[in-house]
Amino acid sequence: PEYRAVISKAPKTVFVTGGTRKMGIETVKQLLARKPKFVVRMLARPSAKNKELVKKIADPYLEVVWGDMKDYETILKCVTGADYVLHIGAMVSPAADKYPEETLYTNIGSTLNIIKAIKEQPDPDKVKFAYVGTVAMTGDRPVPVNWGRCGDPINPSAHDYYAMSKVFSELSVFDSGLKYWVSIRQTGQYPPDQGAGEEPIQHHQNPNNVLEWSTAVESGICMANLCEDWVPEEFWRKAYNLSSGKGWRFAHWELMNFSFGPMGIRYQDVFDVTKCALYNFHGHYYTDSDLLDDILHFRVIPPESYRAEATAEMEAMMKNPMIAAMMPNTRSMKENLEKISHKEMGTSWMLENNQEDWIHAFFGSREKQQQIKSVEEGYEFYHPSE
């Protein structure tokens, strides 16, 4: 009888933005895996890449709306009839660094569109809105302030228009007057986006900067779980930090060595640490990220098991001579990273072109940059204390 009651219940409609990106696609997959509980309505830009992706996940319980989340009428169409709105989509770095005005317009505008569209519904109180924020809103947190929680001061880094856009977007959610809203502040997601590997952001992070990472699959489980009937009333109208737990606390150089290891490459051998920023990134360990998992129960993969499987998969690929031949070696990666640092917004670009405001933000001063020891001179790599 209980099972029949579940399967005979009308499915809930979940509107998802950003469903073609990492966290979004994992969320869509998780929701579709629970059919007939949910009908997923996904907004996607009509690019050739997105259309190919949608073909791979086509499902009777998936409705795709082609459009732009900056367009209010499109958002209204997607929100109408939805029980849940999961606003995962955003312009993120490094694209956000290149197009700051579009980033502000897209990220803030889409959030305001969703809030307005929910208020246009016959009963706005029946719509539950989950907004995805970011750890970048709290800005640079070097040792000894490398711990944080929701409630800490909002202080986005200089030149970080993505973070600034998310600050104003989250504030709009907090002040929306909606009955059901929540902000899920995302951290770095593993695996990292490959596209960022060719961008100056590679040098914007101090080697010893920390993040408490999340896995993409567990992020998707988190978002799907918040759509379940068993989520308590007290979950709503709060902000939460999302991570996959203390087993994912890494300094930047540690995480990169985990990723590079199967290729026989070390961070220390390919990055010129004298050109890596001292300040002005973001990230910290969390004192409160267990709170979200205590409610939504999304941490299902032991960190050690996940990393061991990822390493084994990469090592198996590297045993294929054709694949191995396409991968960089230490020399080629080092040369490429040097080229990247000279791109606009890169750290070498800042120094060579006397971009004093950028130098001040990322190094404090030109003198401080010149005092950074090289690896050969004894630069200290360490894991900040937990």
Model-derived segments and their meaning:
Residues 105, 137-181, 204-206:
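Catalytic helix-loop patch of NAD(P)-dependent Rossmann-fold dehydrogenases
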Residues 167, 191-201, 226-240:
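Glycine/proline-rich active-site loop of Rossmann-fold NAD(P)-dependent oxidoreductases
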